[in-house]
Amino acid sequence: MKELGMVGGLGPESTVEYYQTIISKYQERIGSKETLPEFFINSINMYQVFEFIEQDNLDGLTDYLVDAVQKLEKAGTDFAIISANTPHIVYDQVQNRVHIPLYSIVEETLAKAKEKDLDKIGLIGTKFTMEHDFFKKPFTLSGKELVVPMEDE
């Protein structure tokens, strides 16, 4: 079985949500609640991520995330995920510098929207995620409308 690595801690609540979902889906697939998946979580400091973003230091953010994924590589993982939307602004740069597949939350969300034949999708996230086009652009290019709430909403 392939080994998953997750960059978590972005915030801790989403890491817990991912963890519980992974366990639930794994047990569903195996057909038993008497087993748990083995995988690695590298919990990083979300406030460091926010600092890089506030300083518009995307190179620093890239380096920080590359280091996080490389630790998962060294642990023996076969692929990785980042458990938050906002860090995906540097997804391509990170993927280009690591040796294992890094699944994109943006591309996976778009694939699910296509699978369900959805043309209009709502996005709720950090202000940064909702203001920048790294999430919106792939949807627009695929003919999907990504709806973002107004600031007062």
Q: What is each stretch, according to the model?
A:
Residues 5, 119-124:
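Conserved beta-strand elements of the Class I
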Residues 76-91:
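N-terminal glycine-rich "phosphate-gripper" loop used for MgATP/nucleotide binding
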Residues 128-136:
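Secondary-structure junction motif
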